[in-house]
């Protein structure tokens, strides 16, 4: 039987974290190419360190002349990301950082296994397992610890960028421990925030005084109590941040990107990957399905797994676990999912409208638990499959 009284912790990192700088650049490259050609193939990886950004991987457009033209725009794309994040420090500045572009054309051997041909449907871009998760403990149907860890950093980024707290730097991390009573989140027992700051004279107490009002307005009323333990910049000064402080790589924050450790993870990162790659698209589909199961009232909590083989279109397996909260047997939900959504790579992309430049915005503050947007962004957060699922169980 599942535990109902416990404390669970999740962390988030800001858009200025070194790994998130890399995720942002990789997704910006993807967006630029997919805006030119919706079926563009992209697998872009980024490495960032002091005064240096290296971008590599595989890309493909049907028009090689256009591809060559876009290779000349990579430097500009990367600098625009760094500028928007806010890096203007001596050893990592959007104007002076050295950008190296090592992107090259995608392997024809990969393409032949993935592309549709004749009566053969498009296959998955790789083998793998992908998980989706949803829980009704928050309005976004996300676990509370990760949802509010993101919210804290997103709010601090807002006040940094709008000039309210210009003393904050782009690099930051948050972590909250949430106590559950009868399976519901009720209070924050501890809160950790480490944020870069531009004034060397500021102490940990000074930083707490600056950020505490914004943290309090972000969390649900009553969750911060007199017993909540605060750790704000616990090591003291945090002036040198971002890739100058620690090297960054694309794809190193996969738990931050998903459910904060509250659900399994298949291991595949998202950023820089076009939607033919099921690491990304099938994980989005799994979240979409799990969220719709919960939104439909079929369960209070749902974990869903999909699996694929490279070159094979249909998923090899679909697994549902409602953690003893289901209104119907889990097997019935699995059957309903097969009826309600085409889970081939092309079916997922069509259903969720993934062949659009909607990825750069996902690179920080979580791929899940965000509001669907009018241009198709975060389409996997829609709850438009609920009636179909209820009718199919």
Curated annotation (Swiss-Prot):
Catalytic reactions on record: L-methionine + ATP + H2O = S-adenosyl-L-methionine + phosphate + diphosphate
Similarity comment: Belongs to the AdoMet synthase family.
Alphabetized PANTHER family for the sequence: S-ADENOSYLMETHIONINE SYNTHETASE (PTHR11964)
Keyword Membrane listed: no
Biological processes, Gene Ontology terms: one-carbon metabolic process; S-adenosylmethionine biosynthetic process
Residues noted as binding ATP in the record, renumbered to the chain: 17, 171-173, 237-238, 246, 252-253, 269, 273
Enzyme Commission no: 2.5.1.6
Role: Catalyzes the formation of S-adenosylmethionine (AdoMet) from methionine and ATP. The overall synthetic reaction is composed of two sequential steps, AdoMet formation and the subsequent tripolyphosphate hydrolysis which occurs prior to release of AdoMet from the enzyme.
Residues holding L-methionine: 58, 106, 246, 277
Location, primary (coarse class): cytoplasm
InterPro entries for the chain: ADOMET_SYNTHASE_CS, S-AdoMet_synt_C, S-AdoMet_synt_central, S-AdoMet_synt_N, S-AdoMet_synthetase, S-AdoMet_synthetase_sfam
Subunit structure: Homotetramer; dimer of dimers.
GO molecular function, one term: magnesium ion binding
Name of the molecule in the record: S-adenosylmethionine synthase
Associated pathway: Amino-acid biosynthesis; S-adenosyl-L-methionine biosynthesis; S-adenosyl-L-methionine from L-methionine: step 1/1
Cofactor(s) required, per the database record: Mg(2+); K(+)
UniProtKB keywords: ATP-binding, Cytoplasm, Magnesium, Metal-binding, Nucleotide-binding, One-carbon metabolism, Potassium, Transferase
Species whose genome carries this gene: Ruegeria sp. (strain TM1040) (Silicibacter sp.)
Residues bound to K(+): 45
Region of interest (Flexible loop), ranges: 106-116
Keyword Nucleotide-binding appears in the UniProt entry: yes
